[in-house]
């Protein structure tokens, strides 16, 4: 392929990709307690997702996603990392 190389592109630098961060165990416990749910009840994200890979998320981790919104300022959501 023309121009191919072994460079890896970090998907987090694209302006449409919201901020993703892996929660610590304490943060995850606090969020789950606030929401009154088990981790498996959160929406899922696969460990093979490009952003999950770029932040080194492992199955069982919980990711906080912070999106900027013109209407609401910031919208925070959470994802449970599954294998795959």
From Swiss-Prot:
GO terms for molecular function: DNA binding; DNA-directed RNA polymerase activity. GO terms for cellular component: cytoplasm; DNA-directed RNA polymerase complex. Its EC number is 2.7.7.6. InterPro entries: Arch_Rpo5/euc_Rpb5, RNA_pol_subH/Rpb5_C, RNA_pol_subH/Rpb5_CS, RPB5-like_sf. This is DNA-directed RNA polymerase subunit Rpo5. DNA-dependent RNA polymerase (RNAP) catalyzes the transcription of DNA into RNA using the four ribonucleoside triphosphates as substrates. It comes from the Archaea. SUPFAM superfamilies: RPB5-like RNA polymerase subunit.
């Amino acid at each position: 392929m023309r121009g191919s190389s072994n460079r890896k592109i970090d998907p987090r630098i694209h302006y449409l990709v919201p901020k993703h961060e892996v929660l610590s165990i304490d943060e995850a416990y606090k969020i789950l307690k606030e929401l009154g749910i088990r981790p498996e009840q959160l929406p899922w994200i696969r460990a093979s997702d490009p952003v999950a890979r770029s932040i080194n998320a492992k199955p069982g981790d919980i990711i906080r996603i912070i999106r900027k919104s013109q209407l609401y300022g910031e919208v925070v959501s959470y994802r449970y990392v599954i294998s795959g």
